[in-house]
Amino acid sequence: MTPPENQNIIEERKELIKEVLSAYPEKAAKKREKHLSVYEEGKSDCGVKSNIKSLPGVMTARGCAYAGSKGVVWGPIKDMIHISHGPVGCGYWSWSGRRNYYIGTTGIDTFGTMHFTSDFQERDIVFGGDKKLVKLIQELDVLFPLNRGVSIQSECPIGLIGDDIEAVARKTSKEIGKPVVPVRCEGFRGVSQSLGHHIANDMVRDWVFTRSDQAKKDGTLKFEGTPYDVAIIGDYNIGGDAWASRILLEEIALRVVAQWSGDGTINEMLMTPNVKMNLIHCYRSMNYISRHMEEA
């Protein structure tokens, strides 16, 4: 039996949960209520639901497919401009939230801590945002001429209205002469960040490595290999840890040709298929592209 003093604490905490839920709209509050509970001794379960898809527009600690692509895989590539394509909120909340350290001059040749968004409004939902996206990419290339490419990170509304970001990517890539990578990472696609990792890996395969293969056929890929070439994959340089790994590898006479995404560049990604070995730090987020290279 729960002592009276503990029962009072339990009731206080239940009231606190009610107070938190009162700030939500009625429909959202009903859904969030299932995820909040007070621990009571002797209960047969934890009292909360889990493994449920993130809801578009509702902040969660778990993240979504967009977070897995933009926040983890693509965002740390420092010399590319990463556009959060959709309403301003997703890009704002994912902006500079991770300590992906990098070397470079922000706004000149590196853009990792900058926030770029197409800032979707109601009219864009009605009429589509393709033209707006084309104009945005063109303007960004004028404003930041030292960028080495662009990634388009789709937010939920883009998938719902069916914008053709692939056509935009092909068109603008020809215009600016740089890689433009469309990533269908709308948040509603995955229960967590995990599917976003997979989608992002697939886009590296389809839009970056194909470019590398073509350059190799054309004889324009400038790469002189050695037997000691390696790539560090899936290290996001959180707090600078990739730099420490790189120093250790170079001390044993390995040549680190590429490291990504942390402090990584699009050119390093293009060179990666030529190395002798991939060294994976975060298996969960980068095993897909590593398996592709192993099997190719």
From Swiss-Prot:
Give the molecular function GO annotations: ATP binding; iron-sulfur cluster binding; metal ion binding; nitrogenase activity
UniProt keyword Iron-sulfur present:
yes
InterPro entries assigned to the protein according to its UniProt record, in alphabetical order: Nase/OxRdtase_comp1, Nase_comp1_asu, Nase_comp1_CS
How is its cofactor bound, per UniProt?
Answer: Binds 1 [8Fe-7S] cluster per heterodimer.
Q: Which residues bind [8Fe-7S] cluster?
A: C64, C90, C156
First-tier enzyme category under EC: oxidoreductase
Keywords from the UniProt entry: ATP-binding, Iron, Iron-sulfur, Metal-binding, Molybdenum, Nitrogen fixation, Nucleotide-binding, Oxidoreductase
**SS bond partners:** none
Spell out the reaction equation it catalyses: N2 + 8 reduced [2Fe-2S]-[ferredoxin] + 16 ATP + 16 H2O = H2 + 8 oxidized [2Fe-2S]-[ferredoxin] + 2 NH4(+) + 16 ADP + 16 phosphate + 6 H(+)
Q: Which positions bind [7Fe-Mo-9S-C-homocitryl] cluster?
A: C282
Give the Enzyme Commission number. 1.18.6.1
Q: What's any GO biological process attached to this entry?
A: nitrogen fixation
Cofactors that this protein relies on: [8Fe-7S] cluster; [7Fe-Mo-9S-C-homocitryl] cluster
Per the entry, what this protein does is: This molybdenum-iron protein is part of the nitrogenase complex that catalyzes the key enzymatic reactions in nitrogen fixation.
Identify its protein family: Belongs to the NifD/NifK/NifE/NifN family.
Its quaternary organisation is: Tetramer of two alpha and two beta chains. Forms complex with the iron protein (nitrogenase component 2).
Q: What is this protein called?
A: Nitrogenase molybdenum-iron protein alpha chain
